[in-house]
C-alpha cells in the first residue's frame, strides 16, 4: 500500500493549501503541502512501549528547572530509579529542594556541572555505587543540560560562543563518554536533547544553533558506533518552548542586551546604530514570550525513547508552523527556503 501511495503523482495525494506566516516578519506565503499524514501530529502518540521501568537507572542532566525538572518527576512516577543531575544542588536551589522533598529512594539529586570533568567522574562513581548490580550497568542517559543566548554574529563575543558550546556541546560529549561503560553493560539508551535549531539555522541565534547542530552530528556518529553494541541513541528536537523553560525573563533579556551593547566595538555600534539594535532586542522579547508552555510532548518523546523496544532516531515535539518550516529548510533547495524566510 505504501509503495502504491508513494508512486502516485503529487496531484493525487491528499494535500492542503497552507497559508504560512513567517513569524520573523509577518509575511504570509501560500504553499501546497503533501501529504497531510506526515505532520508531527502522527508522532505525538506513541505505541510499542516496552516493559515497565521496574527500577532501571536513569541519569538526567540539567534538572534544576525546565525539561529536566519535569522529566525527573515524570520518569520517577513511571518506576525508574532517577538520578537528577543539578547544577545548583550545592547552593540549595528551589528545584532541587522540591525534588528532594519527594523523599523517594528512587529519586536522588546529585551535584553535576557538565562542564566540570571532576564532577562528571564523581557522578559516575555515585551512580555506580547506587546501583543494585553495577555489572548490569545503567539503563539511560538523558543529556538535557543546556543554556541559550541571542544576538547577531557581530553582536556576539567569542566568549559567549565558547560558553554556550562548553555547556551544550562539550558538556554532552563529556557526560556521554564518561557514562558509556555503564550504558554498554545495560545495552541501554542515550537520549540527547537537541532543538529544531539543530536542523535549521535562525538569525540572532548562531551560538545556540552551532551547538545544537553539533549535537545532531555527535548523536549520529554515536548511534552508528553503538548499534553493534546494543545501545540505542535518539535525538529529541523540541520546538519553541522558551516560555516553558524560563530561560529568559524580560529583565534577563535587557541585562544581556545592555552588556552586549556596552561591549560592542565602536565601529559595529556606529555602522548598525542603536535603533537597529533595539529593534532586534524587541523581536527577541516577543519571541521569548511566545511558544508552548505545555512540555508534555517533549516529556512523552523522551519517555518513548527510553522505553520503546524500537525508539525513533529523531523526535519532533513542536507545533505545525515550526515542523513545516523545518521540512522546507531541510528538504527543499536552499533557494526556496531563502525566498520564503529571508527578505
Swiss-Prot record:
Q: Where is the transit peptide?
A: 1-46
Its chief place of residence is: mitochondrion
Catalyzed reactions: (R)-3-hydroxybutanoate + NAD(+) = acetoacetate + NADH + H(+)
Q: Which residues are catalytic?
A: 209 (proton acceptor)
Which residues, renumbered to this chain, carry the PTM N6-succinyllysine? 103, 259
Modification Phosphoserine, positions: 246
- Could you say which EC number(s) this protein's record lists? 1.1.1.30
The post-translation modification note in this UniProt entry reads: Acetylation of Lys-132 is observed in liver mitochondria from fasted mice but not from fed mice.
Q: Could you tell me where this protein is found in the cell? A: Mitochondrion inner membrane; Mitochondrion matrix
- Which of the seven top EC classes does this enzyme belong to? oxidoreductase
Q: How is its activity regulated?
A: Requires phosphatidylcholine as an allosteric activator for enzymatic activity.
Query: Superkingdom of the source?
Result: Eukaryota
- Entry-annotated residues carrying N6-acetyllysine: 73, 97, 103, 132, 177, 212, 258-259, 280
The alphabetized UniProt keywords are: Acetylation, Allosteric enzyme, Glycoprotein, Lipid metabolism, Membrane, Mitochondrion, Mitochondrion inner membrane, NAD, Oxidoreductase, Phosphoprotein, Transit peptide
> Oligomeric state and partners?
Homotetramer.
Family, per entry: Belongs to the short-chain dehydrogenases/reductases (SDR) family.
What is the protein named?
D-beta-hydroxybutyrate dehydrogenase, mitochondrial
